[in-house]
Amino acid sequence: MSLLKEFKAFASRGNVIDMAVGIIIGAAFGKIVSSFVADIIMPPIGIILGGVNFSDLSFVLLAAQGDAPAVVIAYGKFIQTVVDFTIIAFAIFMGLKAINSLKRKEEEAPKAPPAPTKDQELLSEIRDLLKAQQDK
């Protein structure tokens, strides 16, 4: 099998396509959550903490010299990233919890008994005939 045919068979499987869609949606969801945290969650928290803008919080390790930029530890951006992660992780947890509860409900649903085989039907007919003969 040629490499192109193998790749086509691999890419056309349902799992690969589902995974690609999930990655694209996940990336878009991550951007939405990042904007939500940076633009909606953190400003009120900053106001509560005395007008702090978290994206500007940093430690200067080495001041800017000439054309060289300052060396800083931007812990404010890190705090925002941790909040992003926490919200995304919680949303994924809640989604998986909902999916798992639906799966459990499907598993708990009583299954219909299997249809009797031809042998079982024949034995039932013989039993019924014998019972009918005894009752006469």
Swiss-Prot record:
Q: Where mainly found?
A: membrane
Its subcellular locations are:
Cell inner membrane
Quick one: a GO cellular component term?
Answer: plasma membrane
Q: Which InterPro entries match?
A: Mechanosensitive_channel_CS, MS_channel, MSC/AndL, MscL_channel
A single Gene Ontology MF term assigned here is: mechanosensitive monoatomic ion channel activity
SUPFAM superfamilies, per this entry? Gated mechanosensitive channel
Report the domain of life of the source organism: Bacteria
Could you provide one GO biological process annotation from this protein's UniProt record?
monoatomic ion transport
Coiled coil (UniProt feature): none
Q: How does it sit in the membrane?
A: Multi-pass membrane protein
- Keyword Membrane tagged: yes
Assembly and interaction partners: Homopentamer.
Q: What does this protein do?
A: Channel that opens in response to stretch forces in the membrane lipid bilayer. May participate in the regulation of osmotic pressure changes within the cell.
Family, according to the entry, reads as follows: Belongs to the MscL family.
Q: What is this protein called?
A: Large-conductance mechanosensitive channel
Query: Gene name on record?
Result: mscL
